[in-house]
Regions:
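Active-site-proximal segment of RNA-dependent polymerases
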Residues: 98-171, 192-215
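Helical (often loop-to-helix) elements that flank the catalytic cores of nucleotide-handling enzymes
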Residues: 320-344
Length: 512
């Protein structure tokens, strides 16, 4: 069945059972009817905290590990992201209105001179008429190319990160810009109901809802002696990390929630901010920054500079003589026009100039102007020092940690499964963590009428992290003097993979 792009089914557990393709017709009629959406009662969001550990190389002391020779790392303050999940029907309502607002935004921004400077959450074709869109690799490359093309000048690159972007969006500014995109003086009643659902935050803590049912969840199970039939039943689950394994589909039904859990609803008295994680949040972030983007672009263009914004990360490249003026200007516009804030520690200043005949980039202290030649421009996951482009080490570290976790999990499954061989399932690991799974392929499924025939789908197997590395290498090769510098960064993964394989296979042998 052909469906609209905005019809996106989710499988995460929420209040009420997930929707299915069978629901498409009535959902389409419902969300496309402004009267229905105007009266729609949104369920509370479910709130979770995602905590990510952050490791940083010590660029001050430059102490190296005696065994490996690598720079020592320290654990930085963990990054906490507050994610809010909408119920399944609410999510599709948000998705549909995201579609409407996104279309209106794209139509408006196409008439603006800063159209190509706003790059996050948008489908920007690689070339005009192409069905392939740009990604962060292309956006970073265009920034580095601008610097490289102007290497006869003394340049400054200012990278700023807006503090707690989604949490601090001013509701009055958002509403004003929303109206601007729709070319209306006030929001229609259906749009206003969606606006209220996002700004008058009501949510439930996931752990509290889980515990209120004594650690049990509604799960989907197959019916005995039936190939197709499914049933929903409540079972006890030890913790939320087993939700996917047990095929948990809901914390409770809508009726159970109304009867038992209304006391768990937290009404956030938030005068600013929208929930991060809803299908509409990303588009609204771009809508919110419309006036800011216009004024900053005009200012930077007037001095022959370069401006690009990727969500809450923005970069400006200008001549060094405008450095202090632009830093002050950006802070003023973020605070007074966008009603947001840039934390001083989140603003990094780099300079590019010729040193001893070599065009070189380095970091400077904003106040003291002290130079740090050990730090180069970091933007969108890449490092650029004026001569070459590399992928940041943090990306490789994340991939390696993921590899280690997968080996541990595979070993545990081999040890405690009913499989008498007690062997690691190698094909899956090779596909996920080596070049063998790096090729991107179109997915084919067996035909429903004839299982011996495979039919082409619209889905792709997008490869693994090495696919991204190879793509980045090909794209950045022109900036790396035709060399495969980025590809060389990944050479150690093959040895690391087999080192882990030998270690975990020896563990299994000892356990037999």
């Amino acid at each position: 069945m052909e469906t609209e792009d905005w019809f996106k089914l989710k499988r995460y557990p929420h209040i009420g059972e997930p929707l299915s393709l069978k629901d498409y017709k009535w959902i389409k009629a419902y969300v496309e009817n402004p009267v229905s959406v105007k009266k729609h009662s949104f369920l509370p969001l479910i709130h979770k905290c995602i905590i990510k550990r952050k490791y940083r190389a010590d660029t001050v002391n430059l102490v190296r590990n005696k065994k490996t020779g690598e720079r020592m790392r320290f654990i930085d303050k963990p990054k906490v992201r507050h994610i809010y999940y909408a119920s399944h029907l609410d999510s599709i309502v948000f998705s549909y209105y995201n579609h409407l607002i996104s279309e209106a935004y794209e139509k408006l921004i196409a008439t603006k001179n800063f159209n190509e400077s706003i790059v996050a959450y948008r489908k920007i074709p690689i070339t005009k008429g192409s069905d392939k869109n740009k990604c962060n690799i292309d956006f970073a490359k265009s920034t580095f190319e601008f610097i490289k093309k102007n290497e006869e000048k003394k340049l400054t690159a200012i990278v700023a990160d807006v503090t707690a972007f989604f949490d601090n969006l001013d509701h009055k500014v958002l509403k004003k810009q929303w109206c601007k995109v729709l070319n209306l003086k006030t929001l229609p009643e259906d749009h206003y109901n969606v606006f209220k659902a996002l700004t008058k935050l009501r949510y439930v803590e996931s752990d509290q809802l889980f515990n209120s049912y004594k650690g049990s969840m509604l799960v989907e199970r197959g019916v005995p002696n039936s190939y197709k039939e499914k049933e929903i039943k409540r079972i006890e689950i030890e913790s939320n990390k087993y939700f996917k394994e047990k095929n948990a589909v809901a914390y409770c039904t809508k009726e159970e929630f109304i009867q038992n859990n209304l006391n768990l609803i937290i009404s956030g008295k938030n005068k600013k901010g929208i929930p991060q994680g809803s299908p509409i949040s990303a588009t609204l972030a771009n809508v919110y920054m419309l006036s800011f983007d216009q004024e900053v672009y005009d200012k930077v263009e007037a001095i022959g500079g370069y401006y690009q914004r990727y969500s809450d990360d923005l970069i400006i490249v200008c001549e060094q003589k405008y450095e202090d003026e632009i830093i002050k200007y950006i802070r003023d516009k973020v605070q007074n026009l966008a009603k947001l804030e840039i934390h001083p520690s989140k603003t990094t200043v780099y300079r590019f100039e010729e040193i001893n005949g070599i065009f070189k980039g380095y970091e400077i202290d904003e106040k003291s102007k002290e130079r740090n030649y050990n730090k180069s421009l970091e933007y969108l996951g890449f490092i650029f020092d004026g001569q070459r482009v590399l992928i940041k080490d943090s990306g490789f570290s994340k991939f390696y940690r993921s590899m280690k976790r997968s080996f541990k999990k595979s070993t545990s499954l081999a040890l405690y499964s009913k499989n008498p061989d007690k062997r690691i399932f190698k094909p899956k690991l090779y596909k996920r963590f080596t070049h063998r799974g790096a090729k991107r392929k179109l997915i084919y499924h067996p035909s429903k009428t004839d299982p011996t025939i495979y039919e082409r789908t619209k889905k792709y197997y997008w490869g693994n992290y090495l696919s991204y590395i190879y793509k980045a290498n090909d794209s950045m090769r022109s900036l790396n003097d035709g060399r495969d510098i980025i590809k060389r960064q990944s050479r150690k993964f093959w040895n690391q993979f087999h080192k882990l394989m030998r270690f975990h296979e020896s563990r299994l042998i000892k356990q037999k």
